UniProtKB/Swiss-Prot annotation:
It comes from the Bacteria. Belongs to the universal ribosomal protein uS17 family. Part of the 30S ribosomal subunit. It comes from Vibrio atlanticus (strain LGP32) (Vibrio splendidus (strain Mel32)). Keywords: Ribonucleoprotein, Ribosomal protein, RNA-binding, rRNA-binding. One of its GO terms (molecular function) is rRNA binding. Gene3D superfamilies: Nucleic acid-binding proteins. This is Small ribosomal subunit protein uS17. The keyword Ribosomal protein applies. InterPro entries: NA-bd_OB-fold, Ribosomal_uS17, Ribosomal_uS17_bact/chlr, Ribosomal_uS17_CS. One of the primary rRNA binding proteins, it binds specifically to the 5'-end of 16S ribosomal RNA.
Length: 84
């Protein structure tokens, strides 16, 4: 088993929970028949210990041990604050 954590970047789509955020990770996949590249989105719950993230922020998250039923990611850093 690898010792390195999986790191992803995404946008915060919800910050209403205490010490938790929901991050949308966007990726492109090639359609198996037509060959066109399509955007696909995955939503993951991440741990935000200090409640530093806001809605629309671009963040970097890393995979960790399961923290709850749905949380297996933790916030590494905020890459870009949302323009309000």
């Amino acid at each position: 088993m690898s010792e390195t954590n999986r790191i992803q970047q995404g946008r915060v789509i919800s910050d209403k929970m205490d010490k938790s955020i929901v991050v949308a990770i966007e990726r492109t996949v090639k359609h198996p028949i037509y060959g066109k590249f399509i955007k696909r989105t995955t939503k993951v719950h991440a741990h935000d210990e200090d409640n530093t993230c806001g809605l629309g922020d671009k963040v970097e998250i890393a995979e960790c041990r399961p923290l709850s039923k749905t949380k297996s990611w933790t916030l590494v850093k905020v890459l870009e604050k949302a323009k309000i």
